[in-house]
Amino acid sequence: MGIFQRLMKNKELIPLAFFISAAATGASSFALYALKKTDVVIDRKRNPEPWETVDPTQPQKLLTINQEWKPVEELQRVRRATR
């Protein structure tokens, strides 16, 4: 007996199947979204410090209000001196 036949036979299972499917889809979507973020390090051998290559002018959040980025001159001098 297939899953659709079982759902049509027991109609009370339809909402349960819907909510379980929606929860699984949401969890999978969030996991993929979280793995694409720049603060997640999966391979430390090839790129040990991925946060150094993040573009500061590009917002990292879903919603950013009035973000302006200006480089801190002292920090830039320290970065150039340590390289």
Swiss-Prot record:
InterPro entries: B12D (IPR010530)
Biological process (GO), any one: response to bacterium
Pfam families on file: B12D (PF06522)
Keywords: Nucleus
Localization annotation: Nucleus
Keyword Nucleus listed: yes
Family label: Belongs to the complex I NDUFA4 subunit family.
Name of the protein in question: Normal mucosa of esophagus-specific gene 1 protein
